[in-house]
Amino acid sequence: MRNIILHQREERDRLLSLPYINRQTIYPVDVLLQSPMIKLITGPRRVGKSVFALLALKNTNFAYLNFDDNQLLTNWNEDVVMQTLNDVYPDFQYLLLDEVQNLPNWDLWVTTLYRRGYNLIITGSNARMLSQEMATVLTGRYIPIAMYPFSLPETLQWYDIDPTNIPTEKHAKVLSLQDDYLRLGGYPEIVKTRALAQSYLSTLYDSILLKDVAKRHKIRNTESLYNLAGYLLANFCNLITANDITTEFGLKSVTTTQKFLNYLHEPYLFFYLQRFNNKLKVMKKAARKVYVVDNGFVSTTAFNLSDNLGRLLENQVFIELIRKGYDTENTLFYYRSRNDKEVDFVTRKGVKVERLIQVCYDLTSEKTRRREIDALIEVAGELKCQTLQIISYQHKEIIEEKGFTIQVIPFMEWLHE
């Protein structure tokens, strides 16, 4: 066990020596470290959860266990592990548990450590396991921190560009990076080397489906799983229903389909947005819109991306809203009016509708412009909301119509609101 933990310490120190950028989270790092509560860092594979935790702890005395290491799991003995940690990391202040969900009964062990007074930082890649089990055993004793692929500002930082102060001579470079980002996404490895996008994302996609879904849930018929995931990718930003999918793929039942949809959400691959309605039963029955965690996964399929720029922008806005702390159960929805006009995003604060957001890549067509404005105004009347936005790719203006003010704001500017 000592050799395993020493080897992991070497890996920890190697990772700490590499160049990184500081990631954006809704909590400042110093505030997180001062809290005795468990810091739970979640998100999809390969987005930098471990690196974020390591950087946060860089100037502290911390112990490290990586549960992606089969040797650690095979030789697991709780008492021996804790004794060895104390030998290898004398008087450590924090304990970082990386991908802890791989340890059987991890939640019980973490609970024990917490009650003994250890200051814990945990990372994991499974939404259901982590949120449900933590909520069950440690309600109110942990701080959730969600990590996603790089945002556009983080991508610019990687290229040594301050997104809040872009010099004139770098405008062309920034526009090029923004175009790349919209199509290829923000996975850290892809941001560093765009030429790897196709092969890297295809491999990562397979890994998520096979390891995080098929293996975890003992799914033998991986063809059905791949077909369903492919269908969701093809229909990103569109409405889906479990009934339609069941019929389309000849699945056993709507219950089976719903189960598969949930499995594909657990590793943060797909998200499902509900239609806003004050009646919960009506809301749960309505079709949902599907979004994917990173636009790069769309680029690994055979779609004609030039036809999808509007959807790619909408998908990215969705991810940014999630990154800002909105969630698809309580605070973020789409809406259709009584006349079937759709608004892409409705945000809610408490019981009050906070904001209506349309996403439109290009407003130069009068027909498109009219459609977006009319939908916003009609829905604003129904939901009694005065804060209206259209997020465009580059266009900016203020529209005054029928007593409403609509802010048209470029995507890059909206990110800094």
Model-derived segments and spans:
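Accessory nucleic acid-recognition modules appended to NTPase machines
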Residues: 195-353
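Short glycine-rich substrate-engagement loop in P-loop NTPases that contacts/grips substrate
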Residues: 63-92
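Hydrophobic positions on the alpha1 helix immediately C-terminal to the Walker A/P-loop
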Residues: 52, 56
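A short, basic N-terminal segment
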Residues: 1-32
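Interdomain motor-coupling "hinge/lid" segment immediately C-terminal to the ATP-binding subdomain
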Residues: 2-14, 127, 133-239
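Domain-level recognition of nuclease-like catalytic cores that cleave nucleotide substrates
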Residues: 393-417
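Conserved lysine of the Walker
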Residues: 49
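Hydrophobic anchor at the beta1->P-loop junction of P-loop NTPases
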Residues: 41
